[in-house]
């Protein structure tokens, strides 16, 4: 089956610190996005890779491995995350794509096994996404004080890539009013069933300064350093 990967990297998040959005900050000598793109370019069965960028980042994006050679296609994002994803989905219309993976550009440590596991789940459901069960105690707070606890039974921390049958998720995005937290929310609003796939703790989203140090340690371990 023909599969495309959409890497969403149009955000301007600054919680990681620094002068650049987190996906453009250096990680082990390369931009975070370079690691993310490498994972999908190496993934089995992915025939097209689209990188969704902010218009201001085009020059940076054109310098990434795979872009100049045409192996990574650039798509400009929209005013929100779901608008950015829809732009990429529309760019694939009529191309014969059957499955699509949608991934946060700031998750550079996604493993090929996780990509394969998520795609395999599409054999039994129109959508699939990795997640990790919540293991910590959960509190509710007000004014800096604990006011209650939350049962964590059945709660998961969502990850990406989130995989879908292409035509189904395209129709779901076209029908959605906007404002979704992720593509699973868009899919469920359209009545699509989404299978939960076993996620991975190492598949972190680099969001805060400490995340970069952890990601560098994991990359070093993977390289046997």
From Swiss-Prot:
The record marks 15, 22 as: Transition state stabilizer. InterPro entries: IspD, IspD/TarI, IspD/TarI_cytidylyltransf_bact, ISPD_synthase_CS, Nucleotide-diphossugar_trans. PROSITE patterns: ISPD. Its EC number is 2.7.7.60. GO terms for molecular function: 2-C-methyl-D-erythritol 4-phosphate cytidylyltransferase activity. Belongs to the IspD/TarI cytidylyltransferase family. IspD subfamily. This is 2-C-methyl-D-erythritol 4-phosphate cytidylyltransferase. It comes from Cereibacter sphaeroides (strain ATCC 17023 / DSM 158 / JCM 6121 / CCUG 31486 / LMG 2827 / NBRC 12203 / NCIMB 8253 / ATH 2.4.1.) (Rhodobacter sphaeroides). The lineage of its organism: Bacteria, Pseudomonadati, Pseudomonadota, Alphaproteobacteria, Rhodobacterales. The gene is ispD.
């Amino acid at each position: 089956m023909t599969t495309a990967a959409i890497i969403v990297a149009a955000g301007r998040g600054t919680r990681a610190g620094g002068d650049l959005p987190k996906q453009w900050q250096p990680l082990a000598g390369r931009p975070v996005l370079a690691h993310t793109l490498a994972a999908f370019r190496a993934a089995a069965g992915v025939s097209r890779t689209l990188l969704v960028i902010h218009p201001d980042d085009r020059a940076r994006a054109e310098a990434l491995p795979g872009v100049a050679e045409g192996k990574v296609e650039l798509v400009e994002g929209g005013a929100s995350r779901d608008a950015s994803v829809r732009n990429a989905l529309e760019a694939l219309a009529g191309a014969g794509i059957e499955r699509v993976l949608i991934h946060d550009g700031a998750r550079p440590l996604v493993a090929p096994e996780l990509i394969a596991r998520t795609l395999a789940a599409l054999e039994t459901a129109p959508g699939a996404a990795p997640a990790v069960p919540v293991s910590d105690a959960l509190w509710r707070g007000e004014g800096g004080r604990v006011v209650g606890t939350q049962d964590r039974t059945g709660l998961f921390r969502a990850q990406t890539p989130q995989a879908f049958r292409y035509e189904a998720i395209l129709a779901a995005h076209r029908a959605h009013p906007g404002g979704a937290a992720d593509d699973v929310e868009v899919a469920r609003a359209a009545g699509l069933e989404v299978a939960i796939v076993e996620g991975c703790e190492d598949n972190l989203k680099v969001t805060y300064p400490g995340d970069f140090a952890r990601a560098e340690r994991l990359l070093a371990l993977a390289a046997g350093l």
